[in-house]
Structure formats: C-alpha cells, structure tokens
Amino acid sequence: MAFFIASSPHAHNRRSTPDLMKWVAICALPGLLAQTYFFGWGTLIQLVFAIALAVTFEAAVMLLRKRPPVMALRDYSAVVTAWLLSVAIPPHSPWWILVIGMFFAIVIAKHLYGGLGQNPFNPAMVAYVVLLISFPVQMTSWNAPASLTAEATSFVDSFLMIFTGFNNEGLSLQQARLGIDGTTMATPLDAFKTALTAGNTASEALSQPQFSWLAGVGWEWVNLAYLIGGLVLIKQRVIQWHIPVAFLGSLTLFSLMFLMFTPGETASPTIHLLSGATMLGAFFIATDPVSASTTVKGRLVFGALIGGLVFIIRSWGGFPDGVAFAVLLANMCVPLIDYYTKPRTYGH
C-alpha cells in the first residue's frame, strides 16, 4: 500500500471566502426585499450604485498597489460591504453620500490597513459613522413606511430624488424631508427618543403612528426578515451563534432591567429587538470574521458588549440607533478580549 506524506493542515474546509460572501448576500435578500417593500425602490437603486462604486474603488486601489484587481474582486467582500452600507442609509440619500461612504469603506477602512483580513474595524460601519457625523440631516431622512403614506414613491421618482435631488413633480429632497409631500419622517427610534426628550412617557411615545403593537411600523418586518436570514447563516455554518445570541441577549437583558425600574422612560425589549438595525447588526455586521473576536468566550463577550453599548447609546446617546458606534467600539476591544479569553495551552 502506498502512503502519501503531506504537510498540515490535513483537514480542509471546502468553503472559500467567495462562497461565504455569497451566502451572506443570499441570506440578506429577505431583509433587502422587506426594506424595498416598506421604504421604496430607493433601497435597490442605492444597492446597485453602491456595488458599482465598491467594484470601482476596489479595482483602482488594487491597480495602485500593483496587484491584479480580479483577485480582489473574486472574493466578493467589496460587494458585501456595499450591500451593508446601502441598506443602512436612507433610500433617498443623495448620490454623493454613497460615493463618500464607499471611498471610506474600501480605500480607508479596508485597504489602508492592508486589505481583506487586515482591517481592525468593520469597513461598512466606519463609512456609516463618518457619514452620520458629517451629514446628519441626509443620514436621518428616512422614508415613511408604505403603509403610512398616501402614495408610494415610484421607481422614477426614487431615481430622480437620488441623482438630481428633485422628484418628477419638481419637489426637492428638502421639501420631501420636511414632509410637504408626506413621504419622509423620523425613524421609530428617533421618534421615541424625541418624545421622551419632550417630556412624554414611554406609553405616550409609543402611541405615535410610527409604532405598531409590536415595534416600529415596517421595521419589525424588516428585522424579522434579517432574523430569518441570520438563522440560515447559522444553520449553514457561515457564522457561529455566539455573537448574535450574546448581542440580542445582552440587549434584551438591559432593556428588561431598566423597564422594571424606569417603565416610563424605557422602551420594551421588542422595540429594541425589532427596530433600527438590530437584527442586521447582530447577524450580518457584528459577525464580520475579520474585525470580531476569534475565541469562543471572546465572541460571547464581544456580542454582549455590543448589545450593552447599543442600549446605552439608544437610551442616553446623541443618536437614535447605536449599532454602528457599538460595533466599532467593540472592534477596538477585540485585542484585549482575545488576550484574556484565549484558551490555555495544554500543559501550561
């Protein structure tokens, strides 16, 4: 019998980086379709434009680094980054928002650190935070869900609003943002925080039309869609369960604790879990294998830290949704988390 001598590793995982990225995109489809249904065609238009920008910036940087662009484009990591950023911004954000955002995501947050596998921060969240701090008006002008508008925004109007700033009737983005055409309004989390700041109780804040019996109108279905996609990712072993479970468990625990002691000032766990970018963050953003913790215990700590930070920022921060800030702050703690949670070497 002939024996073959080969060097380690002897066990191989057939899944490559492109395969994993494809699974992430496929499982994000339910959330994308839900967002498109409730918030209009602008979501799909932004996605296509973001992917085109991501591919362009990725190829340009690879050429500047004197490396073949095809190799970088084949892993689809730029496409996933574009996907995550495009669904995180308002559907009718002006086109230059994505240009700036994708530049920061691909060129600064990814390739400035050495490319895929070297970036300490999630590129999409770096871009989102830069945009949110620099252009708060454009980044907080969300459409009202389709069920709360008299007439849904057409594909042509969405396209024109993004690339010209005016819809087919000549209304500017600023006019739409002020509610003249009734197509834009604050997100449920923003409306809840504004109502509390104005002196209303939590129950009074939740009586606004942005909220249903479960959570924010439209947003609850978007989050449930991302939850379904996230569970498929876990079942397919594309991601592990530790970070999402710790994230959602920590957020639920904090909201329950404060709901018990300050019921008039705290949103219920369902509001926190099914509003904003909670499920998108738990399953598709925080689980980034490059910028997340690598040890089993570390992933639990990492996820719990994000969940706690999300609750703190939503409750007392200056922004209604804190997922992006929480993820970046947790990314900063990853080296420390991994150092103290690494398994002991046998015999030491």
Swiss-Prot record:
Q: Does this UniProt record's set of keywords contain Nucleotide-binding?
A: no
Write out the transmembrane intervals: 20-39, 72-91, 120-140, 214-234, 241-261, 266-286, 300-320, 321-341
**Which GO terms fall under biological process for this protein?**
electron transport chain; transmembrane transport
Keywords assigned by UniProt, alphabetized:
Cell inner membrane, Cell membrane, Electron transport, Flavoprotein, FMN, Membrane, Phosphoprotein, Translocase, Transmembrane, Transmembrane helix, Transport
Task: Please state what the protein is called.
Answer: Ion-translocating oxidoreductase complex subunit D
Q: Which HAMAP family match?
A: RsxD_RnfD
Topology with regard to the membrane? Multi-pass membrane protein
Q: Where in the cell is it found?
A: Cell inner membrane
State the family named in the UniProt similarity comment for this chain: Belongs to the NqrB/RnfD family.
Q: What does this protein do?
A: Part of a membrane-bound complex that couples electron transfer with translocation of ions across the membrane.
* Pfam families found in the cross-reference section: NQR2_RnfD_RnfE
